[in-house]
Amino acid sequence: MTSTLPYLTSPPATHPSNSDHKKLRSACDSCHQCKVKCSGGSPCFRCTSKGLNCRYGYQNRAGKPKGSKNRKTLEREHQLRMEWLTSQLRDANGGLGNLNIDLSDPTTLLPSPFFQSTRWKQGHMLPQSSVQPTPANQCIKSTEHESECLPTPQGLDTWTMDLGPIAQTPRESTSESLEAFTTPISFTGGGETYLRQLSDPTTPISFGFPSPHARLDGTGDPCACVQTQAVNISTLHQLTCRDRSDRFDLAMKSITSTLETCEKFVVCEACDKSVASILLTLSAIELIFTLFEQLTMNNRRLSPPEEEQRLIPCSLGDYKVTKEESQAIRNVLVKMTLSKGKQALNALQNLVNGSVDFLDESGPCEASQHDSNNANEPMLSGLSVTDRNYMTQCISRKNAALEVLMAAVAV
């Protein structure tokens, strides 16, 4: 016996096409839209009681496809991948950190198996018959004794090809504090002893870098001016690479030490006044001006509360200096340091323009190299016209910037 109630009858059977495999919803469209439970049937109880049109639509699966990953899963996989990469780079940097690199010996830059004689000369060389007579090959033929040891790009080991990611990673500092690295070395006390340790190849802190263009004294060490300036440049790099210079004392100490080294370099008779040594001094002055700009900007703007807590306390005996007085003292110190910088620039300008002929034993080689590159360019006092003009322009630009900085500091 079939029931006469319309809501107890089953919905008509539908035969969807085999192409889409869609199924009907268990709730009618009206109940689905109102988000209420549907009794089923055609029509359902709710549509019958309210006189609605009861229709059943196909299911609409709008979710992600099967096998897709959500954001949390992707972030977790990325984090695991980055942790693995970091561990690999840390192991690689730890292995490379204990190496004693000597630039004068190119074999130290590649692993020892890479320089096996049979493998180097037989396995990694192109046959001479395959070399085309191009202009580049003609240049290579002029230095056959050097090109015989050069490998082909296809023959390079995986070790040498994978150095790119390691070289591009930022250098991790051993300490977040600026006090961890060496402060500038003065010319008093044990500065020269420490500098001799820096140049000693037997010590673990030395990498055996050759120092050309530096005049050696009786013990075989370069002049203390050049060595101290190199240490100052390393310290200035540490200070200028930070986001902001929050240590006024370290900045002033580095600037003062570098300016004193510049003045001693100009008047020192043992120093070699070559192009390389003068460019080293100009590089130090370039880094000094970066600190000058930071100090000038910090003096002109108001310090936020978190920076005021890091200010170094200042006192004169039992008298404690206030914040305004401490700022005035800073301005005076910056102004005096800018004046010292102007004196150092003037002394360096006089050295470039009116220096005598400072040429060491390597001078004839440098002069012949200049003559081969610029045959018609005269050499004046050990410096070419191009070198002298370039240095003069650099010093002039720094003098102009110095005038602006001195006008910006109010005393």
From Swiss-Prot:
It is found in: Nucleus. Keywords: DNA-binding, Metal-binding, Nucleus, Transcription, Transcription regulation, Virulence. GO terms for biological process: positive regulation of transcription by RNA polymerase II. Residues 1-17 have a biased composition (Polar residues). Induction: The expression of the hexadehydro-astechrome cluster is induced by glucose. Expression is positively regulated by the global regulator for secondary metabolite gene expression laeA and is strongly induced in conidia during neutrophil exposure. InterPro entries: Stress_Response_Reg, Zn2-C6_fun-type_DNA-bd_sf, Zn2Cys6_DnaBD. SMART domains: GAL4 (SM00066). GO terms for cellular component: nucleus. One of its GO terms (molecular function) is zinc ion binding. It comes from the Eukaryota. Residues 1-21 are annotated as: Disordered. PROSITE patterns: ZN2_CY6_FUNGAL_1, ZN2_CY6_FUNGAL_2. Residues 28-54 bind DNA. Transcription factor; part of the gene cluster that mediates the biosynthesis of hexadehydro-astechrome (HAS), a tryptophan-derived iron(III)-complex that acts as a virulence factor in infected mice. Positively regulates the expression of the HAS biosynthetic genes. This is C6 finger domain transcription factor hasA. It comes from Aspergillus fumigatus (strain CBS 144.89 / FGSC A1163 / CEA10).
